[in-house]
Amino acid sequence: MKKLVYTLFFVLISVVANGQAKYVFYFIGDGMGVNQVNGTEMFQAELQNGRIGVEPLLFTQFPVATMATTFSATNSVTDSAAAGTALATGKKTYNHAISVNEEKNAIQTVAEKAKKAGKKVGVTTSVSVDHATPAAFYAHQPDRNMYYEIALDLPKANFDFYAGGGFLKPTTTFDNKKAPSIFPIFEEAGYTVARGYNDYKAKSQNAEKMILIQEEGANPSCLPYAIDRKDNDLTLAQITESAIDFLTKGKNKGFFLMVEGGKIDWACHANDAATVFNEVKDMDNAIKVAYEFYKKHPKETLIVVTADHETGGIVLGTGKYALNLKALQHQKHSADGLSKPVSYTHLRAHETCADL
């Protein structure tokens, strides 16, 4: 099973470096195991058609599929840093490592190889740009929590397009010391920072390199869950669309684009099934954007969809040989989205949570 992971990586290296595919999409569903996918398809079938069965996602209809184990070099249960490193480099490492080996030496990533081969490169996510999975493609640090240091690696990689919720520690080092803001550093390195989809459209034409994050004041750690989304919120599909737009403008030698559905994992940590299924569907919507591009360039495009690991041990079944997935249609917010505005200490004496 270890060979399957390496095979995936070496296939990517081959198509990027040897010109077998001009355009490469690498979608990663963080925490997305088999049951997260199956559950989403069953959930869709019951909600859309009122029947037991599956309503297929686009990516489950792709012609080639396989399975792989996910243990790291040091742990039976990996984390996103070690798993992201494996997906980015083809090498196993210790938990918390960002594209360094067990001796803490940097390992070259497939994105870096693509850049050296003359491709444009994009690294995107629905969580923060300095989070473990996206970081594994452009940074080399001994600990995933070194957010400031990871952000400093971003301009060193010199990739063309980055996108996500924002940056977690833009002015604070790993040892909690005050540091210069990363944003002027990005700008000095030639990056244009766009805040929101409309700002991207206004700035992209004149930008040489782009960092797309959420609007000022939004939570920098992530995009909102799909189930909580408001009209003006940035989406993973918009990020994918923007990345394609940016990476194909000007001299077009092809691109390598990594897109992470990072909050599948977060919803699984919360044991929030309705939010999980909505997040898987949301990543599928981003894959549809790539698929529309593929239909215009079918002989030049490769789309790979994978996961770094499964989260939560989700089980589809009960002791009564039944699932009540339709009950989840009544959930209108994530557990996280509901808990933030609800504070039991602020309820008036005559109120209950049902009143809010």
What is the meaning of each model-derived region?
Residues F10-N18:
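Hydrophobic h-region of N-terminal signal peptides that target proteins for export
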Residues N75, D79-E102:
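A glycine- and small-residue-enriched flexible loop/hinge segment at structural boundaries
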Residues F10, V34, T89-T93:
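Short helix-loop boundary/capping segments at the starts of domains
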Residues L8, S128, G166:
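Residues that line or immediately flank small-molecule/substrate-binding pockets and catalytic motifs
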Residues K22-Y23, M32-N38, M42-T85, H131-R348, ...:
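A post-motif C-terminal structural segment
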Residues I28-G29:
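Hydrophobic residues in beta-strands of the RecA-like P-loop NTPase core, especially within AAA+ ATPase
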Residues N95-A151:
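Extracytoplasmic mature domains of secreted/periplasmic and thylakoid-lumen proteins
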Residues K2-T7:
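Sec-dependent signal peptide recognition
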